[in-house]
Amino acid sequence: MSTAVMWLLLFVVVALGILIAALSKTKFTTQKIATIGIMAALSFVAYEFFRIPNVLGTGSSFHLGNTFTALTALMLDGVSGGLAGAIGLALADIMAGDPGYAITTFILKFIIGIVCGVFAHKVFKLQDLSAADGVKYYVAVIGSAFSGLLVNVFTDPFLGYFRNRYIFGQEADLASTVAKITSGVTLINSLLSTVCAVVLFLFLIHISEPT
């Protein structure tokens, strides 16, 4: 697939993401937009400077970029978390000259944020809990953070297979092998990002509580 078509697909994906965000019931205040921007920047930095790139030549990397997708979803909501991760990490791919990767990155990170947000605020109702609730609270925080990152263990290699097969033109056997390796890499990333997101969330909640 030509680079021009990749850029066109990326534009369509980003436009759809923005449309979904606009059609959602999410209220975007100035403070929330600023927070999304900061978290997107932190996602970019975490990916660019805290990663082991191109594991086994697959194009996948060990990194902590997903931390801030989950963290934003826990702090705000799923759409905000999805936008923060999608913007920050897709931008990292664009800066690296990989619009093909940016297409799937935007979709995957948006999904992570949405799932984390649903579990945090709809399933566990994290906004109604506090450290005083003990184990229930910590299970809710960990479960919410890990939910979206666990989904990514399956969606990343799945979308990655079709990206490598039809955008990059890899042979089916090679694309399948890369997808299997990617699944393992993504699992490790998910575990690391869950730990980081949970620790950061608990720390931020602690320091924001009135003394």
Where are the model-predicted features located?
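Loop-helix junctions at membrane interfaces
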Residues: 1-208
